Amino acid sequence: MQQIMVSGTVAFLVSIFLTPVLIRYFTNRQLGQEIREEGLQSHLRKRGTPTMGGIAIIAGIVVAYVFTNILAMIQGVGGFTVSGLLVLGLTLGLGATGFADDFIKLYMNRNLGLNKTAKLVSQLAIALIFGFLVLQFPDENGLTPASTHLSFIRDIDTIDLGFGGSVFGIIVFLIFIYVVVSAWSNAVNITDGLDGLAAGTTAFVMGAYTLITFWQFRNSCDTAVEAGCYTVRDPLDLSVLCAAGLGATLGFLWWNAAPAKIFMGDTGSLALGGLVAGISVVSRTELLMVIIGALFVIEIASVAIQIGVFKTRGKRVFKMAPIHHHFEALGWAETTVTIRFWLIAIMAVLAGVGVFYSDWLHLAEV
């Protein structure tokens, strides 16, 4: 528990103090967000607001994770693990993609940033590398960071995407990992359209997973094989990483809350999406994440529905997509939308954690 608290605190401090440095840097160089003329008129006031604040979030996560693990090694109570490093690598890889996108927008005056092909290839390569590596590095019990089984609260034994380790099965598993990584990174990216919405929602999700992974650590099959134990590798280190994600997003939210002094940009949203995706895979809770991250699911689903219906029927389901802009178009104030969406996110998190704990109670009583 001490490691988790240290990680969250360090991440918060790094993020909250580094963010204003970035605000001054980008403001002094007149590097800010471009706002589309065809968008909501109320958003035009945001033109010129500094972006790339995700740098502070990533820095907070990295510094906190590294500091906490070095401290644990000095004290002889833990250290870096394969699972944690792989998720951190996924986070940094997607963050680098987002950084390149933001850099091109700001410094090369190309409003669209990376072209779609370059972004797709980058996400695909990063996801495939992650998917391959999470099946490597077995520990002394033969447990790898992830398994080829689809998972809800734990692995579903009857659904093996790897088909017993066949070449076809591994391809199917890698495709699945790409879908998970792409979906979550794009979902967080799409949600980042209102001041504080993506940062706050991610903080709720990371808070939930800090608890979940710590519970997996306390009830790990590595320490005691009993009813309800979890076959998750390195759960304590994953909890440390989740706490870093929680602290870093809260520190950034201090400056990103309405009226935002800075945006996280693709640097932050893609990185956080990678963190969400990676944690769901290595904690073996991919389907549970759909409940806990339900607001992200709603946001990306609204875009898919809008595009699908418009292309097939020539009609729009929403006034604007993603759905948070729909409510703005109906006349809701931005802060009203954000707070109400936060409430939805909190209810989803509570529901997901409740399902997770209920499963453990049921198995523990058997």
Curated annotation (Swiss-Prot):
Catalyzes the initial step of the lipid cycle reactions in the biosynthesis of the cell wall peptidoglycan: transfers peptidoglycan precursor phospho-MurNAc-pentapeptide from UDP-MurNAc-pentapeptide onto the lipid carrier undecaprenyl phosphate, yielding undecaprenyl-pyrophosphoryl-MurNAc-pentapeptide, known as lipid I. Its cofactor is Mg(2+). Pfam families: Glycos_transf_4, MraY_sig1. Its main location: membrane. It comes from Corynebacterium glutamicum (strain ATCC 13032 / DSM 20300 / JCM 1318 / BCRC 11384 / CCUG 27702 / LMG 3730 / NBRC 12168 / NCIMB 10025 / NRRL B-2784 / 534). GO terms for molecular function: metal ion binding; phospho-N-acetylmuramoyl-pentapeptide-transferase activity; UDP-N-acetylmuramoyl-L-alanyl-D-glutamyl-meso-2,6-diaminopimelyl-D-alanyl-D-alanine:undecaprenyl-phosphate transferase activity. The gene is mraY. Keywords: Cell cycle, Cell division, Cell membrane, Cell shape, Cell wall biogenesis/degradation, Magnesium, Membrane, Metal-binding, Peptidoglycan synthesis, Transferase, Transmembrane, Transmembrane helix. Pathway: Cell wall biogenesis; peptidoglycan biosynthesis. InterPro entries: Glycosyl_transferase_4, PNAcMuramoyl-5peptid_Trfase, PNAcMuramoyl-5peptid_Trfase_CS. Its EC number is 2.7.8.13. GO terms for cellular component: plasma membrane. The keyword Cell membrane applies. It is found in: Cell membrane. This is Phospho-N-acetylmuramoyl-pentapeptide-transferase. The chain crosses the membrane at residues 3-23, 54-74, 76-96, 118-138, 161-181, 197-217, 238-258, 262-282, 287-307, 341-361. It is a multi-pass membrane protein. GO terms for biological process: cell division; cell wall organization; peptidoglycan biosynthetic process; regulation of cell shape. Belongs to the glycosyltransferase 4 family. MraY subfamily. It catalyses: UDP-N-acetyl-alpha-D-muramoyl-L-alanyl-gamma-D-glutamyl-meso-2,6-diaminopimeloyl-D-alanyl-D-alanine + di-trans,octa-cis-undecaprenyl phosphate = di-trans,octa-cis-undecaprenyl diphospho-N-acetyl-alpha-D-muramoyl-L-alanyl-D-glutamyl-meso-2,6-diaminopimeloyl-D-alanyl-D-alanine + UMP. It comes from the Bacteria. The keyword Manganese does not apply.
